[in-house]
């Protein structure tokens, strides 16, 4: 993965965060994307201290414009994108009959 540019959505926690650390340790240039910019910046700082090249972009994957801005910022910083890991996701626990349509729409939009 050395010098590959990888975008990871959902990078502020869980699997996305773990992927960011692993890929950075393998030499990838990592673009962190998530709604929680504070956590992204914390991860970015930690990875930079370890010698990684990192860019954090606040991104709501349910918004088309935010996704376009993510791609544009990645290209502006690194000049290319080699891989996109669509890791952002949310879940819900409810019976379908009890579910509000807006909640279902949000789950579908993110996932």
Regions flagged by a language model, labelled:
Residues 5-8, 84-85:
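Conserved hydrophobic beta-strands of the Rossmann-like cofactor-binding core
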Residues 95-96, 100-105:
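Substrate-binding pocket helix/loop in short-chain dehydrogenase/reductase
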Residues 40, 67-74:
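A conserved hydrophobic alpha-helix of the Rossmann-fold in NAD(P)-dependent oxidoreductases
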């Amino acid at each position: 993965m050395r010098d590959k540019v990888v975008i990871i959505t959902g990078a502020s926690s869980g699997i996305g965060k773990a992927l960011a650390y692993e890929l950075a340790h393998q030499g990838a240039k990592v673009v962190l994307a998530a709604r929680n910019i504070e956590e992204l910046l914390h991860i970015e700082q930690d990875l930079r201290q370890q010698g990684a090249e990192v860019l954090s972009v606040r991104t709501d994957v349910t918004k088309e414009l935010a996704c376009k801005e993510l791609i544009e910022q990645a290209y502006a910083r690194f000049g290319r994108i080699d891989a996109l890991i669509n890791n952002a996701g949310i879940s819900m626990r409810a019976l379908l009959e009890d579910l509000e349509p807006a909640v279902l729409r949000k789950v579908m939009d993110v996932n």
